[in-house]
Amino acid sequence: MCKVLNVSRSSYYSWLRRSPSKHSLENRELFYLIKRIYELSKRTYGSPRVTIELHKRGFHVSRQRVARLMKSQNLKSIIRKKWVITTYSRHNYPVVENKLNRDFNTTRPEQVWVSDITYIKTLQGWLYLTVIIDLFDRKVIGWSFSRSLKAAHTSIPAWKMAVRNRMITRKLIFHSDRGIQYACHEFANLLSSYNLVERSMSRKGDCWDNAVAESFFKTLKVEHIYHHSYKTIKEAELSVFEYIETWYNVNRIHTAIKTSIKDKKEKFINQLVA
């Protein structure tokens, strides 16, 4: 080996005994934290979210360095899959114009809520999940499980949960697609009883008008649902409930707001009382 490297035997053994460099030690400590954050995210975080979490913990490191360390140990975010649009809008109920117009930026809670419905497969049949999300902090503030697609079992109970969780005290835009659950008289009349609520609907066949809600379902399925095979409806309900209430709504980093939902709300409250 010494002949190949063209160095003396003493120099070679001196190199072997040499202590790791400061940079190597930093990388070792950094990688330990990166791996810990990656595992806590259930292998869903890529370098952007891992970097945000490191910054929160006081480690000011570039995303490029995090990406290199993750790549060196083959730490990859779960591959994302395409999602299926499941809106049924072939009905005769009146629809409203798109007042949101893809403006997903808000300055306070209870300014814009978005909603959508998705399907979850189980061996007992389909389970339908309806969610309502506050655009300010991306929190799922209302949701409902059902075996039926009627508004009484989807949009209406999700709305009732949302208004229990967050009081409407100022003008609120409620945005959804044109699905029958949002256009029907039962749901329209319910929202009209709230004077501060203004309805908004996506343009026909345009999923990007409701991109935040669509993105949530994509995240839910890629990070969680696709890794489970649900035998029963109850099993699926419990699994999705735990994902929303113990991970997504609490600790998950959201790149759109560059923090977790909990931290975003706390920062807003601190600004109000400052």
Per-region residue spans from a language model:
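Mobile genetic element proteins and their domesticated derivatives, centered on retroelements
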Residues: 1-2, 12, 34, 50, ...
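Conserved, non-catalytic sequence blocks in retroelement Pol enzymes and Pol-derived host proteins
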Residues: 21-24, 58-60, 88, 104-106, ...
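RNase H-like two-metal-ion nuclease catalytic core shared by retroviral integrases
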Residues: 89, 176-178, 184-185, 199-221, ...
